[in-house]
Amino acid sequence: MPNEPRESSPAYEAVLLIAFGGPTQMSDVRPFLDNVLRGRPVPPERIEAVVHHYELIGGRSPLNELTFRQARALETELRAHGPALPVYVGMRAWEPYLHETLQRMRAAGVRRAIGIIMAAQQSDASWGRYQREVDAARARLGADAPQVDYVDEWHAHPLFIDAVSDRVAAARTQIPAERRAAAQLLFTAHSVPTAMAAASPYVEQITDAACLVAERLAQAHWSVAYQSRSGSPREPWLEPDIGAVLRALAQRGTRDVVVVPIGFICDHVEVLYDLDIEARQIAEAVGLNFVRNV
């Protein structure tokens, strides 16, 4: 993995976790959505619907808090096993913005950092835009901005597969023991335009990771669905949609479904509303027992 830090190359002075960001209180939601949309025309009723989604999940996204917890855990791990590097957090769409974090890093004397994009699968939406945002932030700071290299993609890393598998195994205990073998694992990821997907390894990496988790758990019944579609209805996006899959599972007699958002590495509105509220309502309406790994 040529972009990873090595013990023989001690030039890295910090780690930078790069995430999307999210509103931390209800008053932040509309400014946050303005940042996300960046002037793109969206029907007002759609914006109001998303605002209501945040109201239903407590008026905030836990993404920022969870990302900082991940940063602290990584910093502790690095202190224990080396190299003992500080871990910073920078966000695309909310505070702390990437340019703010890079400015703090520069002030602390950081010249070169290793960046970790907080998404396990690669597409332009999940990786490319983040790298361009880092480039723009560095350009804003000027020639002495910290250099940022990136770890390679990690969709099939054994520790990632183990972590997801452990959470899924815990979720399956909510299903009666005699029905677990017949339960359906339904892996989900954010839908993206099909043209974007075709230009990236996104679908292959999602499917590969899902297969590895299913094999690790010896679970024969599994499939992949996409969620949280947005954008123009005239533009084709990845399918099948999770709602359609849940209805089809019920029609073929499935009783239990364990939903695994393998395309996300922590909770936020697409998990807490799109899955825990919207998808759960669909499942319950068609008679499915809906369980999600947490």
Residue map of PLM features:
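Active-site-proximal alpha-helix that buttresses catalytic centers in soluble enzyme cores
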Residues: 2-294
